[in-house]
């Protein structure tokens, strides 16, 4: 019996599909589902989103969005935290935050989950950087380290607890150390 190959979905066809839980991402004709959030990732995502919001909100500099679908450059990804500076946040006709973000974040933050490919996550970060994102972080809770990149050609690893992590220039009020971030897992 001859099997007809299944035609891969286009990005537009993917976006018309119902959302999945956990979220699915699209790139290069492939759909991949993110792993189900687990304890460490959930705590880091919650606490980091809160910490960023505390720093951003007084001056309305930016907003941190957990699990926000960002579609740009032929891909549709869902960073664990997507940060947008205030004037780049899409708005609807009523001036409210749009439900659809057809643009790259200014800062993308991913948290490595058990069983998730570090390469796949880095590809998403590099895709963001190639399309205008200022910085990407990859938190590895099992190794208590943070990989920081401001271009696909440059990745730095931070693992000393007292190390203050670099941030994009718009976020210069944010002063977080490796120890503070991974300390949230023991609270």
Positions of the model-derived regions?
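Gly/Pro/Ser/Thr-rich low-complexity, intrinsically disordered segments predominantly at protein N-termini
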Residues: 1-187
């Amino acid at each position: 019996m001859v099997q007809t190959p299944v035609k891969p979905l286009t990005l537009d066809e993917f976006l018309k599909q119902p959302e999945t839980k956990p979220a699915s991402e699209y790139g290069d004709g492939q759909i991949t589902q993110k792993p189900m959030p687990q304890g460490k990732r959930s705590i880091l995502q919650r606490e980091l989103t809160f910490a960023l919001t505390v720093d951003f909100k007084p001056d309305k500099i930016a907003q941190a969005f957990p699990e926000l679908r960002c579609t740009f450059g032929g891909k549709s990804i869902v960073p664990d935290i997507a940060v947008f500076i205030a004037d780049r946040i899409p708005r609807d006709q009523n001036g409210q935050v749009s439900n659809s973000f057809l643009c790259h974040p200014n800062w993308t933050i991913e948290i490595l989950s058990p069983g998730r490919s570090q390469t796949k996550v880095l590809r998403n970060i590099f895709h963001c950087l190639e399309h205008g994102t200022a910085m990407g972080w990859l938190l590895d809770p099992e190794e208590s380290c943070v990989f920081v990149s401001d271009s696909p050609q440059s990745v730095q690893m931070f693992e000393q607890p007292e190390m203050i992590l670099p941030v994009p220039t718009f976020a210069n009020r944010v002063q977080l150390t490796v120890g503070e971030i991974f300390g949230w897992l023991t609270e």
